[in-house]
Amino acid sequence: MVRISVLNDGLKSMYNAEKRGKRQVMIRPSSKVIIKFLIVMQKHGYIGEFEYVDDHRSGKIVVELNGRLNKCGVISPRFDVGVKEIEGWTARLLPSRQFGFIVLTTSAGIMDHEEARRKNVGGKVLGFFY
């Protein structure tokens, strides 16, 4: 597999394993951004538990899948998004208004678009899942 970005490779392997009906998937290499992205997905119930395995190299993450993930992806390049522009990005990326989440990296950390709107912070778009 050609390494485009670590986050893109991790989300793509999760999506492919979900389509094949697998119960768990191993993501490697790991990064802090992937772990924060997975925490947001887990908070909304799209994945089960995940575990970081330190192999004294770049590390691995084993993710439990629960069959709820339909699509996930990375937005590249990471566009700047203000608080007022979040609504336009959700309309463009997600299938409906109340379905799915956009993940942003902000000055307050990595969070979904609803939490960013509540905290009134903008940032850069990392990706989406639904």
Swiss-Prot record:
One of its GO terms (biological process) is translation. GO terms for molecular function: structural constituent of ribosome. Keywords: Ribonucleoprotein, Ribosomal protein. Gene3D superfamilies: 3.30.1370.30, 3.30.1490.10. One of its GO terms (cellular component) is cytosolic small ribosomal subunit. It comes from the Eukaryota. InterPro entries: Ribosomal_uS8, Ribosomal_uS8_CS, Ribosomal_uS8_sf. Belongs to the universal ribosomal protein uS8 family. This is Small ribosomal subunit protein uS8x. It comes from Arabidopsis thaliana (Mouse-ear cress). The lineage of its organism: Eukaryota, Viridiplantae, Streptophyta, Embryophyta, Tracheophyta. The gene is RPS15AD.
